[in-house]
Amino acid sequence: MFIRTLDELAAAGRIKSLVNDTTRSARFLTAADGMGFSYNDNRVSKGSDAVLWYKHHWEANYIIAGRGEVTDLTTGQSWPLEPGVLYVVGPNDRHRFRVTEDEHHVSVFCPPLRGDERHDEDGGYAANGPGPQTDRRMFLKRADEIRAAGKGMVAANGQARTLRMLTKADDVGFGFSDVHFAAGAEATLWYKHHWEANHIISGTGEVTDLTTGQSWTLEPGVGYNVGPKDRHRVRAHTDIHLVSVFCPPLEGHELHDADGALAPSDPVPPGPEGY
């Protein structure tokens, strides 16, 4: 398992300024990590206005704070963006992303970004391996609607509440969940058949590698990443809110077994070099 922090990313030159310096993009995972996807933590200033078109990727954006609007430039349809909204765009979706209040979101790409890309004149990124071949169009999901429909789950053997917002059926190459641990929760987990990235949004806690005994502090802006070799324990000192990305994606109905694992769903990415 491995941990990423904003301080480490800054020291490594992995925090990029985009969209006329209105966006700070921290590249937490890249293609080199071998997890089947990449993700960024993005903070965007009020007034940012970008036309984007990811011809070679799927991108999912989960709004954590702030407000804005996304518009499908093919149909003209617009959707308001606010905390708890997840919108997904792909090769067919030339779109406009406009921010009306300082905004914070997590962005997941598949295929993964190398991490050094800049938007081209169409608002896209260069291909990095085979891209999706699809006729699907952009779509949105809302955490409050999923919760109101009774589709939330209790997971981690009773220690967490999760909304599985993207699953294998969405066919974007990864799964995405919104997860809450209550203060005092403790879970032993072991994803034998998956890679999982966890990005802390709020709260504090600790994650421990149960093979080596090494522990790391969990706090906002920390990402911890676990794979098939990483039996680990998560402890919540306060209420923790995080987002979780799985590859291969979950079917969506899985529950943790006695080892803290989830059933296999597809081939497992190799992970970082030397893993």
Where are these regions (language model features)?
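A short, N-terminal "cap"/entry segment at the start of jelly-roll beta-barrel domains
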Residues: M1-S38, R118-F174, D257-Y275
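Conserved short histidine dyad/triad with adjacent acidic residue
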Residues: R24, S38-K55, G175-K192
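Short, conserved beta-strand element in jelly-roll/cupin
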Residues: R43-V44, Y54-V70, H180, Y191-V207, ...
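Short beta-strand segments in beta-sandwich/barrel cores
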Residues: D49-V51, G66-D72, L86-Y87, E186-T188, ...
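A short hydrophobic beta-strand segment most commonly corresponding to one strand
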Residues: A60, V88, D102-R118, A197, ...
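A cytosolic small-molecule/anion-sensing beta-strand core signal
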Residues: I64-A65, E82, E101, I201-S202, ...
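Short acidic-glycine-tyrosine-enriched beta hairpin
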Residues: T75-N92, T212-K229
